[in-house]
């Protein structure tokens, strides 16, 4: 039974971020959402420039827009690759079985889509034992750590709700 869902998880993260940012900037939530939509539109234009995108990831609402527009499909791609590619799945298992954990470097890691995609893939496998992941995030935008931590908290909350308080009963 897979309980980790990309849109549900990111929806909780985005909703909490919008509430916090609106409070910090002293603006209504609705205004924050409008600004997110504006960032989505502007970011789409930037990505199509031949000179390379100039996206203001240092702005919190821009990062929320990225979470909304890009994180779900990216997390789905991560999960799909690990689910469909037996070679990478077997390699992942070999590393975990030999070392007791899998260390992953998220280079240009962004908002945490690797964490979300792998968590869903691992849970769906229903292996009967816990997989331990150790992430190293390398990104020129240090603020992405906030969304990584938020995604991790929502995943942990979901796992606790569905598997109980004993973390050794969790799949990840």
Identify the role of each PLM range.
Residues 129, 134-139:
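Conserved SAM-binding motif I beta-strand of class I
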């Amino acid at each position: 039974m897979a309980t980790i869902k990309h849109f549900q998880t990111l929806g909780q993260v985005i909703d909490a971020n919008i509430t916090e940012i609106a409070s910090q900037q002293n603006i209504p939530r609705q205004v924050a959402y409008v600004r997110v939509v504006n960032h989505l539109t502007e970011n789409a234009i930037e990505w199509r420039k031949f000179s390379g995108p100039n996206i203001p990831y240092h702005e919190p609402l821009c990062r929320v827009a990225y979470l909304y527009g890009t994180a779900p499909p990216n997390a789905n791609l991560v999960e799909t690759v690990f689910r469909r590619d037996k070679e990478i799945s077997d390699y992942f298992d070999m590393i975990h079985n030999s070392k007791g954990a899998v260390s992953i470097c998220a280079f240009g890691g962004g908002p945490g889509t690797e964490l979300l995609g792998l968590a869903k893939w691992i849970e769906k496998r229903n292996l009967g034992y816990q997989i331990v992941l150790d992430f190293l995030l390398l990104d020129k935008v240090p603020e992405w750590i906030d969304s990584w931590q938020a995604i991790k908290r929502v995943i942990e909350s979901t796992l606790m709700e569905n598997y109980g308080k004993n973390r050794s009963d969790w799949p990840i």
